[in-house]
Amino acid sequence: MGRAFEYRKATKLKRWGNMARTFTRIGKQIAIAVKAGGPDPENNPHLRAVVATAKRENMPKDNVERAIKNAMGKDQKDYKEMNYEGYGPFGIAVFVETATDNTTRTVANVRSVFNKFGGTLGTSGSLDFMFSWKSMFTITKKEGVDMDDLILELIDYGVEEEYDEDEDEITLYGDPKSFAQIQKYLEENGFEVKGAEFTRIPNDEKDLTPEQRATIDKMVERLEEDEDVQNVYTNMKPADNEGEE
């Protein structure tokens, strides 16, 4: 397994611990996708990808359909995707992705958490160089498929040679700009796409003591308690026992 897998697995275990929070996060993604491309998943690849992620995370079908219906309503809030970047304690880089209908409220809340933990909120783009932004596709294993051949077919779309493999799933990483092309190829070639989203992987990780790690975990948890926050990424190296089953 690659470094991206270990980082993603460890952070996912924390991030998806609260089911209600997960459904709220996906609901906002559905609203953004519907506003951009319409309510029909068949004609809206972005929405189709979000619905696949909702299914993987066990979000009830009724909830998904209700979120799509609500997104078409005239009273639906207009969410804006905003990123906030800065440093937490111990020099750890913290990248916060949000979807908000009130940026003034959101930046105040995010800054408050940074201040509480002795961190500093920086300017937009200040941490771009510290993280690699990737498209990420989780597909069901398909009998008779040679992974080397599949990667070769997708290499023009920026899909990386290194991939993650679980018992019945494979996760591919690619160029974010080629998200739609990768999704189209996988669907047209009969792959079951169980999740399609974007992620950020730290280019270098910083090791901490258990006590320092606990402080960063608390900071991330506090950030994720804000309903506007979609994802929180750090360059903290996962503990040796994190990411294991």
UniProtKB/Swiss-Prot annotation:
GO terms for molecular function: DNA binding. Pfam families: TACO1_YebC_N, Transcrip_reg. Residues 225-245 are annotated as: Disordered. It comes from the Bacteria. The keyword Coiled coil does not apply. Keywords: Cytoplasm, DNA-binding, Transcription, Transcription regulation. Gene3D superfamilies: 1.10.10.200, 3.30.70.980. Its main location: cytoplasm. The keyword Transcription regulation applies. It is found in: Cytoplasm. Coiled coil: none annotated. GO terms for cellular component: cytosol. GO terms for biological process: regulation of DNA-templated transcription. InterPro entries: Integrase-like_N, TACO1_YebC-like_2nd/3rd_dom, TACO1_YebC_N, Transcrip_reg_TACO1-like, Transcrip_reg_TACO1-like_dom3, YebC-like. Belongs to the TACO1 family. NCBIfam families: PRK12378.1, YebC/PmpR family DNA-binding transcriptional regulator. This is Probable transcriptional regulatory protein BF2589. It comes from Bacteroides fragilis (strain ATCC 25285 / DSM 2151 / CCUG 4856 / JCM 11019 / LMG 10263 / NCTC 9343 / Onslow / VPI 2553 / EN-2).
